[in-house]
Amino acid sequence: MKLEHPDRLMNRTPLSLAALETHDAFAERHIGPDAASQQAMLDTLGFASRAALIDAVIPASIRRAETLPLGPFAQPKSEAEALAALRALADKNQVFRSYIGQGYHDTHTPAVILRNVLENPAWYTAYTPYQPEISQGRLEALLNFQQMVADLTGLAISNASLLDEATAAAEAMTLLQRTGKPKSNVFYVADDVLPQTLEVIRTRALPIGIEVKTGPAADAAQANAFGVLLQYPGVNGDVRDYRALTEAIHAAGGHVVVAADLLALTVLTPPGEWGADVAVGNTQRFGVPMGFGGPHAAYMAVRDEFKRQMPGRLVGVTVDAQGKPALRLALQTREQHIRREKATSNVCTAQALLAIMASMYAVYHGPHGLKTIALRVNRIAALFAAGVKQLGFATVNDTFFDTLTIDTGARTAQVHEFAKAKRINLRRVSATQVGVSVDETTTRDDLADLLDVFAQAAGGTAPAVDALDAGLAGVAALPAGLERTSAYLTHHVFNRHHSETEMLRYLRSLSDKDLALDRSMIPLGSCTMKLNATSEMLPVTWPEFGRIHPFAPAEQTVGYREMIDQLEQMLVAATGYAAVSLQPNAGSQGEYAGLLIIHAYHASRGEGHRDVCLIPASAHGTNPASAHMAGMKVVVVACDAQGNVDIADLKAKAEQHSKDLAAIMITYPSTHGVFEQNVREICEIVHAHGGQVYVDGANMNAMVGLTAPGQFGGDVSHLNLHKTFCIPHGGGGPGVGPVAVGAHLAKFLPNQRSTGYARTEDGIGAVSAAPYGSASILPISWMYIAMMGAKNLTAATETAILNANYIAKRLAPHYPVLYSGPGGLVAHECILDLRPIKETSGISVDDVAKRLMDYGFHAPTMSFPVPGTLMVEPTESESQEELDRFIAAMIAIREEIRAVEEGRADREDNPLRHAPHTAAVVTANEWPHAYSREQAAYPVASLGTNKYWPPVGRADNAYGDRNLFCSCVPMSDYA
């Protein structure tokens, strides 16, 4: 309910408690325009109500008849109520000390990083840094990440993160397939690789015809493989010398991928120094909580010859318009939004926020601090090994960094029983072996407890830690010949910010350079940059969610699994499908999973030959990239002059490929920002030819509560929880990409059999390293839905559509709106056509994007889905005041363009061509331009009270790609 204005309450009979309870208060905070503003915008559009507008925008044939069936979450909860309800679920989890290892370790997040990065909206509400001039802070943090990874792995170049270690290993496999031994389709995986990694590799390999072989690492050179994956150290703790093996693999024409533990590499010889071609791994133990599996930033580092084949983001150094160093995303032509089915990967969002945390962990500790942590971890492992041997147990591995595998024989069950009594988790290697992985958080008291567990099982007394320590004095605990001797993290950034004062100021200096949602709206079309409310973010840092190992026993994760089940049902209600899996940890992975599910469905019906995927020409680049990865052949369907799917062309191609048609991938509303009237017909055509309908859920923010893909003909969709359901973009990740399916596809949802998570017997293999993907950020979406309730979720969708149409209407006299539906209306976004301006003035869409920075705005999406256009999506969270500020900026820019068109301003020397303008340029002694300094920096009066200064001038992208440099910049370059 809405509260009446306090002034109107003063002279009335006291209201009841029910009338005063503010369950809807959060919705009023989340939805930007108040009732008066909404009515004013509706008046501008010529509609009496929001309902009338929605009736005109959305085809009646697909309108949802019923209210969102959210069950117990239909009524909104207040922020306090939602937090209390989620706290009750969190309290059902049991936080044990987990020494399971297997790629996940407990860690200490330095408080200065927790408060000033993870909990700071300046970092977590930013977008992927496609606009480099207003992204220099996070680009520098990601460049630090790349430098950290390259240094620790001993390889030439690293990317700016991948989704998790398992998918990074799978990406390495396909990288080597593209570049490696031409006559082999074999990828060899050593038998001590993490089991979840092997499962994801098998999932990825099957549809593209790669044969995965496994066996002892020693046999790899004889496998005739184009690539070999080694684990360093191995899952059971062994640290092996792979130098001779690597030489033999190279001699046989293969390449070597090493999955390496970065903390171990501070004390072990790095893979790059013994011949590895690619290194992959996880940076989770660099200050990022386990979080029941994620999100965490994986990495990939490669030899120089592979740099142009790497997947994911790559930050590079270039110069700006004044010749000063500037950072930007390099080699973007590798990526799916440009190369589509020929891209190096379908990865779009990665794990930027977590990569930034990991890089700052290295900055804070520095090389000496990291090595001290590593040596302490290794020392504890050595003392544990000595202690269990004294108790009569044998260790399977004699070499180790942090992990021991113990032969426990008939006493295995007792060991686990005694460990459970002390709230300790150990790895269940087999019926006769137990694994123990210690970490940064392991103390001498923890070590004493571990030893006591084994002592109880042995019927003896645990040796004292101090006595063990004294007995091992002078004894090297690392394997002989593999101690690291090379320097790392020598750049000044890793050797300066070690006091909290310095670290705090460094983080502040970086965040001040960037433009995120905490400063202004980010009207990126197809990106849904909406409010990420603080109350939604709070539970992410609760230890009951953060300190849970993804492979912890089920009885310890009851609350997590209840929350996940509830969220899945919420998404079922929103989409109209029958079932949802939250395992995919990005939209790209949900999309890929959906296509594998379609293939599994066809195969189950004896139609595994169906491999043609129809994709409209307007589709997002991930669609064809994912289809290619899923082993499908992409056939493009034309769009008509209004931007809709060309029905005649669709019918012709569906008929042509009828016997082999697997699916069509459509986006709804379309990527042109319109509710296509004939979407049901599209679905019926494909179904008539035996295909399945994949509805890309990127634009779900225009559908929640009003229509549903599962009700108008969709068979499968992925969603973007980092768009519609309020998980923040984090500067380029994390994201969550659930896959939602109809009842006939539910049994094919992804499993993770290697770790005991089998959802259904017929499910596809794992698409992420952890059973529930990025589980620790799922509470964000749970909180959002719980606080909004059914009615307000629908109101949010309606307001997003209202805001988009208001912008389109106000800007149409200045910039043509390229596509619209009946009545000239759009969905939740609109495309502004700047191509005529280019013809009349020479001003490009890039010039307008850069000029918006001077006005304090991040540009809308550039040149997608149509080159030379801007796609604007305001979301429901922006107030009319902010919308009007953006509209005023766009109109002012149009007047600046008109001055060029009319000859009042020079075609080259004008504010657009030289944008953005830095404070250094505006305040310099020399001002060489015909326009004034005031016009450059303060083109509208509102900037006088709230001015954002871009830290660099326009970045030279071509220079950066010609002179590729992806490491930290020497201080001298900034002089």
Curated annotation (Swiss-Prot):
Pfam families: GcvP2_C, GDC-P. InterPro entries: GcvP, GDC-P_C, GDC-P_N, GDC_P, PyrdxlP-dep_Trfase, PyrdxlP-dep_Trfase_major, PyrdxlP-dep_Trfase_small. One of its GO terms (cellular component) is glycine cleavage complex. The modification N6-(pyridoxal phosphate)lysine is found at residue 723. It catalyses: N(6)-[(R)-lipoyl]-L-lysyl-[glycine-cleavage complex H protein] + glycine + H(+) = N(6)-[(R)-S(8)-aminomethyldihydrolipoyl]-L-lysyl-[glycine-cleavage complex H protein] + CO2. Coiled coil: none annotated. Keywords: Oxidoreductase, Pyridoxal phosphate. Its EC number is 1.4.4.2. SUPFAM superfamilies: PLP-dependent transferases. GO terms for biological process: glycine decarboxylation via glycine cleavage system. GO terms for molecular function: glycine binding; glycine dehydrogenase (decarboxylating) activity; pyridoxal phosphate binding. Its cofactor is pyridoxal 5'-phosphate. Belongs to the GcvP family. The glycine cleavage system is composed of four proteins: P, T, L and H. NCBIfam families: gcvP (TIGR00461), PRK04366.1 (NF003346). The glycine cleavage system catalyzes the degradation of glycine. The P protein binds the alpha-amino group of glycine through its pyridoxal phosphate cofactor; CO(2) is released and the remaining methylamine moiety is then transferred to the lipoamide cofactor of the H protein. This is Glycine dehydrogenase (decarboxylating). The lineage of its organism: Bacteria, Pseudomonadati, Pseudomonadota, Betaproteobacteria, Burkholderiales.
